[in-house]
Regions:
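A charged, aromatic-enriched C-terminal amphipathic alpha-helix characteristic of glycosyltransferases
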Residues: 254-296
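Nucleotide-sugar donor-binding catalytic core of glycosyltransferases
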Residues: 1-236, 242, 277-293
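Short coil/turn linker and secondary-structure boundary residues
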Residues: 180, 244-247, 262
Length: 296
């Protein structure tokens, strides 16, 4: 059965990861701006929603004998209403909350990664710059003064960052998405071996996927979405470094420097493991979603 993604112009424009959504998560499905009942009939409709889920739209889609897959984005705090979930055939959403994915909803809910920003990728792994030839040991470009960040991670990261010295290139911004343009940001990330990924409003950040796509090794604290087999743990443990606290970052970066001095290939090997894992993961999540949609 044919699948078509639909969303209003505002949401499609605001979804920074739209290429990833269309081509990785939903296997290249067509996208329609808005709802066209004369076109969308007797097929699988993937309804992308960033804000309030429209029960009226779901009803209209049902009248045309469509199967409805809700792709629910943007619920960073897990507080949005899920009342309309039961009126869909399948729900796919990002931002992992165990109470949502382990609860007995009236419909199956599958987690999907946010993915990388459009323009970051897709990157062919054979053309990714080796870690050993990158300019900076690590870098962070983004908003540090986010008082709403999960468990105060941005504040904790900002406090310890100066202790990293020359091992961390830091470019702080004054707000969300107020930094360098996507081209310069990509170049800078591709010039960095590691990318610390402190949580934003939610533990899951787009930065982590930007880093993976660019062959930049993420550094994170431990979070459910990284560990759970229903999320990034789908194909086994993530191969990138997981710290207990951002206070460990200066020591970690220093230890890497010492390790590389005695084992020059260490960085390239770690990078290769991350690239291979991310490549396999994209295939696995695409297959999981496609197979589930085919059974509707």
């Amino acid at each position: 059965m044919k699948s078509t993604i639909i969303g209003n112009a505002h949401d499609l424009n605001a979804a920074q990861e739209i290429w990833f959504i269309q081509n990785i998560l939903f296997s290249g499905s067509e996208i329609n701006i808005g709802y066209s009942p004369n076109i969308l009939r007797d097929q699988t409709v993937i309804y992308l929603e960033l804000n309030e889920i429209s029960g009226e739209l779901i009803k209209q889609l049902r009248l045309e004998k469509n199967k409805i897959v809700l792709y629910h984005m943007g619920d960073e705090f897990g507080r949005m209403s899920r009342e309309q979930y039961r009126n869909c055939d399948l729900v796919i959403r990002n931002y992992y909350f165990d109470e949502i994915f382990s609860s007995k909803e009236d419909v199956e809910v599958i987690w999907a990664p946010c993915g990388f920003k459009t323009g970051i990728g897709p990157r062919e792994s054979v053309y990714i710059k080796p870690a050993s030839k990158r300019q900076w040991r690590s870098s962070f470009f983004g908003w540090l003064e986010n008082s709403a960040s999960y468990n105060g991670e941005r504040e904790g990261f900002a406090r310890i960052a100066p202790e990293c010295g020359e091992d961390l290139f830091l470019q702080a911004t004054s707000g969300f998405a107020m930094g360098w343009n996507i081209g310069l940001y990509s170049i800078a990330m591709e010039s960095s071996v590691f990318a610390p990924c402190p949580a934003g409003n939610a533990p899951e950040t787009i930065r982590l996927y930007d880093a993976l796509e660019l062959g930049c090794i993420p550094i994170s604290l431990s979070h459910d979405f990284i560990i759970s087999p229903n999320a990034l743990g789908l194909i086994g443990p993530a191969p990138f470094p997981i710290l207990n606290s951002w206070n460990e970052l200066p020591t970690f970066l220093k230890s890497i420097k010492e390790k590389v001095s005695s084992s020059p290939r260490e960085l390239d090997d770690m990078q290769a493991r991350c690239i291979a894992w991310w490549t396999d993961y994209k295939i696995a999540i695409q297959r999981k979603i496609a197979q589930r949609i085919q059974t509707l």
